Amino acid sequence: MKYIGAHVSASGGVENAVLRSVEIGANAFALFTKNQRQWQAPPLKEDTIEKFKRFCQVHHFSPAQILPHDSYLINLGNPEAENLAKSREAFIDEMRRCDQLGLTLLNFHPGSHLNKISEQDCLARIAESINIAVDSVPNVVAVIENTAGQGSNLGWRFEHLAEIIEQVENKQRVGVCLDTCHLFSAGYDISSLASCEQTFADFDKVVGFEFLRGMHLNGSKTLLASRVDRHHTLREGTIGTDVFKFIMNNAHFDNIPLILETIEPEIWAEEINFLRSLEQN
């Protein structure tokens, strides 16, 4: 089964993300469980938690279909001790919020070395941050998102993801989310069915499909290997649509959230239908 949805707004309460997903015909969704541009947020209220769980049950969303995203402020590889501690504390809070909502995944951008420490040191800090978080909060899997490689962001090479996972002690509590725009911008060609075969074979060899816990399905405004992260709609931009056909007809992408973060929310329902039309039963 393909779980397809979008990163919907949780404005007015996280329970509203469920209803907004139903409106666009989704059977998956992503959300922020707090304001993504603030360090701290009020705790989730009991009635909010109850409504979220009830709405998920009524509309048949299981935890496997929901991919929460953490705050953009968090940098789990921060070279500065004070800011690293602040990021780790915020990440644990994000994990705790997911656990309170009955969710089992938390998607995050791995981190940046800020040109102050080596890549290896930064990757080790990210892995240590994951170890601390999963020791602090039960049930929730830390899902590392591949990046486009802008600036000093790590996670744009499969080897970065593999190196983090290797240093995480509990392999059951770590996974990966692949973003198609980020893959392309990082230099992984996914513009044809043949190049998709090669790129995802490389992913399986270096990281392993057993760690794939979600996908972000996005077009790109920039060229292959641009190292610039600019999302586009599915059918516009530089990647083309073969990658989406590949994903929709490959069992490796079954039963994980396939999440749109494309730039026109008003056509998300149409894009979900487009993806479903690519399935060759």
Curated annotation (Swiss-Prot):
Catalysed reaction, written as an equation: Endonucleolytic cleavage to 5'-phosphooligonucleotide end-products
Positions with a binding annotation for Zn(2+) 3: H182, D229, H231
Residues annotated for Zn(2+) 2 binding in this entry: E145, D179, H216, E261
Main function: Endonuclease IV plays a role in DNA repair. It cleaves phosphodiester bonds at apurinic or apyrimidinic (AP) sites, generating a 3'-hydroxyl group and a 5'-terminal sugar phosphate.
Record's cofactor remark: Binds 3 Zn(2+) ions.
Organism whose genome encodes this protein: Glaesserella parasuis serovar 5 (strain SH0165) (Haemophilus parasuis)
Stated name of the protein: Probable endonuclease 4
Cofactor(s) listed in the protein's UniProt record: Zn(2+)
Major enzyme class: hydrolase
Keyword rRNA processing attached: no
Recorded GO MF terms: deoxyribonuclease IV (phage-T4-induced) activity; DNA binding; DNA-(apurinic or apyrimidinic site) endonuclease activity; phosphoric diester hydrolase activity; zinc ion binding
Record keyword Metal-binding present: yes
Family assignment from sequence similarity: Belongs to the AP endonuclease 2 family.
Keywords, ordered alphabetically: DNA damage, DNA repair, Endonuclease, Hydrolase, Metal-binding, Nuclease, Zinc
Gene3D superfamilies linked: Divalent-metal-dependent TIM barrel enzymes
Taxonomic superkingdom: Bacteria
Residue positions binding Zn(2+) 1: H69, H109, E145
